[in-house]
């Protein structure tokens, strides 16, 4: 099979991952914090090493990752592994997250390469100008989100007060390795190619719920050296990302 963009049908699953057994508690007295004052645009790429159209989309998102005010994340999905190459970065929960967007946006299928911007809209990753336009339009959309503050200790994050959506929101931690990574693909449509990725996600966890009141959450304790974490507050219903921040050094 040699196609630019792939789609796959199947039952719609609820977006989610393994819940963290952390303690969520009201944010009390504040310690020294690092605050991200600018609301970023979150760009989530769903890709696969065995998808022939994905290397081009990976390059589009890598270019976006260098733009100020953009948080770019790469999720490798596993539903193309059966074609002959098991994706080295894929995890089942990443495909579940993509299917959550499929349900919220009422899409007929999931596909690769797909780019989701701020959880509000999606576009094919093969369409570079369309991706850039969507990011620019979302950057111009400014709301009044809750503030996210990473504690200097590195083990906790606070989400401040704000207007919660009807039905509430969820707080997610996305652990990723900043920068590019390359993989030599040994099978499938990209056999023999070196496929480059940026900001590859390793772990996705729900930290807890957010209902508009300040809460302090424990961050995943199993991060590896060199990894960073994005914390995002996301509408439970339509999956819109209300706000996000990364602890990656500026």
Where are these regions (language model features)?
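Charged, low-complexity surface segments at secondary-structure and domain boundaries
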Residues: 83, 118-121
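Active-site-proximal cofactor/substrate-binding loop regions of enzyme domains
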Residues: 3-6, 13-105, 109
């Amino acid at each position: 099979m040699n196609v630019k963009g792939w789609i796959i049908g199947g039952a719609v699953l609820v977006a989610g991952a393994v819940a963290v057994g952390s303690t969520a508690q009201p944010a009390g007295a504040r310690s020294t914090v690092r605050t991200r004052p600018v609301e970023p645009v979150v760009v989530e790429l769903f890709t696969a090493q065995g998808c022939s159209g994905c290397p081009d989309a990976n390059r589009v998102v890598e270019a976006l990752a260098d733009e100020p005010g953009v948080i770019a994340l790469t999720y490798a999905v596993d539903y193309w592994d059966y074609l002959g190459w098991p994706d080295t970065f894929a995890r089942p929960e990443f495909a579940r997250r993509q299917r959550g967007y499929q349900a919220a946006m009422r899409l007929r299928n999931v596909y690769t390469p797909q780019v989701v911007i701020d959880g509000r809209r999606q576009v094919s990753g093969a369409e570079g100008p369309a991706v850039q336009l969507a990011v620019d339009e979302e950057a111009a959309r400014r709301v009044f989100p809750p503030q996210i503050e990473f504690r200097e200790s590195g083990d906790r994050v606070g989400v401040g007060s704000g207007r919660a959506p009807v039905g509430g929101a969820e707080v997610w931690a996305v652990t990723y390795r900043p920068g590019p990574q390359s993989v030599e693909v040994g099978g499938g449509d990209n056999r023999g190619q070196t496929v480059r990725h940026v900001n590859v996600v390793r772990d996705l966890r729900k930290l807890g719920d957010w209902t508009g009141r300040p809460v302090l959450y424990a961050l995943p304790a199993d991060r590896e050296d060199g990894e960073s974490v994005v914390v995002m507050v996301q509408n439970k219903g339509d999956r819109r990302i209300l706000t996000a921040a990364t602890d990656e050094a500026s």
